[in-house]
UniProtKB/Swiss-Prot annotation:
It comes from Mycobacterium leprae (strain TN). This is DNA-binding protein HupB. Its EC number is 1.16.3.1. Binds to human laminin-2. GO terms for molecular function: DNA binding; ferric iron binding; ferroxidase activity; structural constituent of chromatin. SUPFAM superfamilies: IHF-like DNA-binding proteins (SSF47729). It is an enzyme of class 1 (oxidoreductase). The modification N6-acetyllysine is found at residues 3, 72, 86, 103, 137, 144, 156. InterPro entries: Hist_DNA-bd, Histone-like_DNA-bd_CS, IHF-like_DNA-bd_dom_sf. Residues 179-200 are annotated as: Disordered. GO terms for cellular component: cell surface; cytosol; extracellular region; nucleoid.
Length: 200
């Protein structure tokens, strides 16, 4: 579709003559060009955004000669299609037979639906993280209990050994004392028997 065809379609939709449709198209184009030239952007909800993009200096090649050519920084006009425009072209949104193809509020509702779809994903990730956390705690707790259980018997064992070692000398001392007493008691008996034999 060229400019003349666009004017013809606009004339039929507006129900006006060709002059008014031509003036409308030319005024819209003129307004967009002047705004973008100033550095402003023209946003048409659902349709897209006309804006100016700055390109930095770069090195390019001449396709014919193959020589490198330095390109100065320039500004170029650009157009970013809107969400509804993209949805209609992609087939995600039905194009109405009558009325405007792009309406207000449709983009906002689509954005809300996208936000609702993204939210459950975050919740699911949070639940997965919550399930992973208890597993780590369960692993750490038994490890600490095992170490304490091992340490306690070790202390008791050392105490038992010390007690046994302390008691052992007492038994030896008592046995020695009893042996000495028995020797003392036996010695006088031998002397008495020897004296009796001398008297006889």
């Amino acid at each position: 579709m060229n400019k003349a065809e666009l004017i013809d379609v606009l004339t039929q939709k507006l129900g006006s003559d060709r002059r008014q449709a031509t003036a409308a198209v030319e005024n819209v184009v003129d307004t967009i060009v002047r705004a973008v030239h100033k550095g402003d952007s023209v946003t048409i909800t659902g349709f897209g955004v006309f804006e100016q993009r700055r390109r930095a200096a770069r090195v390019a090649r001449n396709p014919r000669t193959g020589e490198t050519v330095k390109v100065k920084p320039t500004s170029v006009p650009a157009f970013r299609p809107g969400a509804q425009f993209k949805a209609v072209v992609a087939g995600a949104q039905r194009l109405p037979l009558e009325g405007p193809a792009v309406k207000r509020g449709v983009a906002t509702s689509a954005a809300k639906k996208a936000a609702i779809k993204k939210a459950p994903v975050k919740k699911a990730l949070a639940k997965k993280a919550a399930t992973k956390a208890p597993a780590k705690k369960a692993v750490k707790a038994p490890a600490k209990k095992i170490t304490t259980a091992v340490k306690v018997p070790a202390k008791k064992a050392t105490k038992v050994v010390k007690k046994v070692a302390a008691k052992a000398p007492v038994r030896k001392a008592t046995t020695r004392a009893l042996a000495k007493k028995a020797a003392v008691k036996k010695a006088p008996a031998k002397k008495v028997t020897a004296a009796k034999r001398g008297r006889k």
